[in-house]
Regions:
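A structural signal for conserved, well-ordered secondary-structure elements
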Residues: 1-293
Length: 293
């Protein structure tokens, strides 16, 4: 597979505009809608039931509404069972009463999570993300000069924020499993970026007279086929899980679907371009400083 040489740096401002738009859309959605946090983070009760005769999600929603349970999450599994999730403060007995009004059913599973436990999980989730980002920054700082580490961590934060924003826009449930998948996406994204950075570092040693922008163009072009092939494989695998994996795997694989696309684009158009523009900015600042007499 051969691809024509592309001047990626030439088009970096277009990628910046797209990235800024996606970040603003994500921020707007997070501010106005927030996230559909699962019971792991909010506390509550999950009931999984099997009706003797098939019922629709709308029937269950309507029955719950009649007993004044308006914020329940109702899902259908691949096997036709119904999952009902209610927040802390709602009574499971009312849910069973509502379900009984529809028809006979068998309770397959019940899971209760207290508000104290969910609060601790929220704190741990935030610290997990912060620790991961700081750890990656330290790793990149040791492996490369700080300029590359900064560009890599900014691109990574960009990827994670857009993935979280996608969950807000679609209002898909965010559980501990989803959080784990987002951290996996972060690892995949930074690995993709590191491959490009390695090639840039190698070319800087081999082609010392070449401008940094040309070095970046050359390095990205040398890796583009590998990046596309790897990303396509992960994307297609994630798509299969999303389409045929059921509700739980669907929510998890959604992070991979969005993360692979955003991470691939950022490793090609954003991370290395940020390194170049930060370096240019620092040079301008240095020139503007008054020289000491």
């Amino acid at each position: 597979m051969r691809i024509k040489y592309i001047h990626f740096i030439k088009y970096r401002y277009y990628s910046y505009v797209i990235s800024i738009i996606l970040i603003l859309l994500s921020a707007f959605s997070l501010y106005t809608r927030g996230l559909n946090l699962g019971l792991d983070f909010t506390g509550g009760t999950m009931l999984e039931v099997r009706f003797q005769t098939p019922v629709s999600v709308k029937q269950v929603d309507d029955a719950l509404y009649k007993v004044n349970i308006k914020d329940a999450v109702v899902q259908r599994t691949n096997t036709g069972d119904i999952i009902v999730k209610i927040r802390v403060g709602e009574k499971p007995s009312l849910v069973e009463k509502a379900l009984n009004s529809i028809g006979s059913f068998q309770l397959l599973q019940r899971e209760d999570i207290g508000s104290v436990v969910s609060g601790e999980l929220r704190k741990k989730a935030v610290w997990a993300i912060i620790t991961a980002l700081v750890g990656i920054l330290i790793y990149l700082s040791f492996r490369y000069e700080f300029l590359f580490a900064l560009g890599g961590i900014l691109a990574l934060a960009h990827d994670v924020f857009i993935v979280v924003g996608a969950y807000s826009w679609t209002y898909k449930e965010v559980s501990l499993d989803v959080l784990a998948s987002i951290l996996v996406v972060a690892g995949y994204s930074i690995t993709d970026t590191v491959v490009v950075f390695d090639r840039i570092r190698e070319n800087l040693k081999l082609r010392k007279g070449m401008d940094l922008s040309e070095i970046i163009n050359l390095s990205v072009n040398q890796n583009i086929v590998r990046t596309i092939m790897t990303s396509s494989t992960v994307f297609l695998s994630s798509l299969g899980l999303y389409l045929f994996g059921g509700n739980v795997l669907s929510d998890i694989s959604f992070a991979f679907l969005i993360g692979v696309v955003v991470g691939t684009l950022s490793s090609i158009f954003v991370a290395s371009a940020l390194v170049l523009d930060i370096k240019i900015l620092l040079k301008k600042i240095k020139k503007q400083k008054p020289q000491s007499i």
